[in-house]
Regions:
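Extended terminal
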Residues: 1-9, 272-277, 309-437
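Amphipathic hydrophobic-ligand
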Residues: 41-46, 72-87, 99, 125, ...
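N-terminal leader/targeting pre-sequences
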Residues: 45-71
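Secondary-structure transition motifs
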Residues: 63-175, 290-313, 406-407
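Outer-envelope beta-barrel architecture signal
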Residues: 98-100, 142, 176, 236-238, ...
Length: 437
């Protein structure tokens, strides 16, 4: 009996030793590389393969991993360069295969419309024992770091963009869910200004990207902060909250509008990022230290301001609520003012081929004193020390029209006719010349 137990123990030791040798050979051979390639490919929903693995203890290195997308995935291609990883073999005793740390030198990822390709039939596999059958069905990666990540994309409309030169650190919290931190990098999409990324924190899983906090800047000192959610399973439906400060007005308004100042505000974007320009933007905007050439819309008001000693019109601030969609902007609760001399309030809309606004304009007696009859016939309401009137704006952004001049001339004509009678014609001509200098 004693000899039998010794023999049985020797056999068990031999089996375990042989199994270890076999498993050791399997891990360091192409079979494990194939198994690992399939697991990673399934995770990124692509077809990929590792370059040969070289081992040092429980760590391995590979020159890279390359993958191509499929028709059901927006990932078109993925190339990972110079990979090093460490496997925690002790987790096998718990039924898990865990890579606890991965370091990557560079990633190049290309997203867009899925690649049309046929699905090859799997080659029949002969039955038999495989060491891969002993491995857990799931592979877990606890943490990875990318020294240089670059993501490129193209929308369904053909607009391209990229997020380049960023460092990414990611930690897996649960199956297919990662906490992501990106530091540095540049984002550019279509013809929009380049955004410099300071730091981004978020979560990504199979269904969505959640941005917990993203901080960025534009040239000129503009600060941007973003939070929100982007669906990635099918359509790129997004809800993004954007706060910004010190945005130069020439980034937003055409040069012909002659606006100057710094914008700040809070905006909410809702829409499909594949059709970004069709999304809806709502929120509020404020412009401080504003300079504006009133002649672009209010030619009359511009001249009155000059005659009133306000040659360079600088508004203390402009505030408004906006709603933008399909290249059309609606504004409400619009308020603009200059000291105690000028106030403009109202609402309206602006599009590529139209301007439509209903405003009320308040002017000081100092300005109105230059136009006889203006207070009595046009600026008839008094409030907050100003005289007010309604103004209708129409036309196009290139050629806006207002109905103020006609009413001022009519009031002036009536005033002159009543006071000077026969000399009214010359007085009216003088006024028209004055208003159109």
């Amino acid at each position: 009996m004693k000899r039998f137990l010794i023999a049985l123990g020797a056999i068990l030791i031999f089996i375990l030793f042989a199994a270890w040798i076999g498993f050791y050979s399997f891990v360091r051979g192409d079979s494990f590389r194939d198994w690992l390639s399939k697991k990673v490919s399934r995770s990124v929903r692509a077809d990929g393969r590792f370059e040969p693995l070289t081992w040092e203890g429980s760590s391995f290195r590979s020159a890279g991993f390359s993958a191509t997308g499929n028709p059901k995935n927006k990932l078109r291609s993925l190339k990972i360069t110079n990979i090093s990883a460490h496997i925690d073999w002790h987790q096998l005793l718990k039924g898990q295969l865990v890579i606890d740390n991965v370091n990557v030198e560079k990633i190049e990822a290309d997203f867009g419309k899925g690649i049309a390709q046929g699905t090859p039939e799997a080659a029949p596999q002969p039955p038999g024992f495989k060491f891969s059958n002993l491995l857990p069905s799931q592979l877990r990666v606890d943490h990875f770091y990318v020294a240089d990540a670059n993501v490129h994309w193209r929308t369904n409309r053909g607009d391209s963009g990229q997020f380049t030169d960023t460092k990414i650190s990611a930690t897996q919290r649960q199956a297919d869910q990662w906490d992501i931190e990106a530091i540095g990098g540049k984002v550019q999409h279509a013809s929009y200004p380049v955004i410099e990324i300071e730091r981004t924190e978020g979560t990504i899983d199979r269904e969505a990207i959640t941005i917990h906090d993203a901080k960025a800047t534009l040239s000129g000192g503009t600060a941007i902060r973003v939070t929100g959610n982007i669906a990635i399973a099918k359509q790129l439906n997004a809800i993004l909250n954007v706060d910004f400060t010190d945005l130069n007005s020439n980034v937003v308004f055409p040069a012909t509008w002659r606006f100057g100042g710094k914008l700040s505000g809070h905006l909410i974007y809702k829409g499909n990022l594949d059709r970004f320009e069709h999304g809806e933007v709502t929120g509020s905007v404020k412009m401080a230290d504003t300079t504006v050439d009133l002649a672009n819309v209010f030619g009359t008001l511009h001249q009155l301001a000059k005659f009133g000693g306000l040659n360079d019109v600088r508004l203390d601030s402009i505030t408004t609520d906006i709603r933008y969609q399909d290249r059309n902007t609606r504004f409400s609760n619009f308020r603009a003012g200059y000291q105690d001399q000028i106030r403009v309030e109202g609402s309206g809309s602006i599009g590529p081929d139209h301007v439509d606004a209903d405003l009320v304009v308040g002017l000081s007696p100092k300005i109105l004193g230059w136009i006889p009859g203006a207070e009595e016939k046009v600026f008839t309401d008094q409030k907050d020390g100003l005289h007010w009137t309604e103004v209708r704006i129409s036309g196009t952004p290139e050629q806006p029209k207002e109905d103020l001049t006609k009413r001022l001339v009519s009031a002036f004509r009536d005033k002159m006719t009543k006071e000077f009678k026969g000399q009214a014609k010359d007085a009216i001509k003088t006024l028209l010349d004055m208003l159109h200098r």
